[in-house]
Amino acid sequence: MKRFGKYRAVKSQCRAGHTHDSKREAIRCNELHDLQAAGAISDLIIHPQYWFVINGRQIKHSNGRRVGYKSDFEYVEKGINVTEDVKGVVVRDWPLRRAIFIALFPHHQLRETK
């Protein structure tokens, strides 16, 4: 019997062999690899991680864990750094995490793909 995640997403692999949290994310990874091969985008990174730091101090949870954001993809498109997240279900903490990311990383364009 297949085991589903919290939102019934099935872990899937893209053609490049990366494991993704959902089929939709794996399909988007294939599209981005095709765009990179065609020269439309460059410097594709899978699952980049960003840590939230304000005034040189790491933001931490009450238990001491660092607060950050792990997106699905990062790439350069027409000279612009794009951070992309494939969204199925919008989770409770996403609006806050999104706002913090935009404030701390203004040189990145954050895109949500449905």
Name these PLM-found stretches:
Residues 1-114:
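Electrostatic, structured charged patches in enzyme active sites and in nucleic-acid/phosphate-binding
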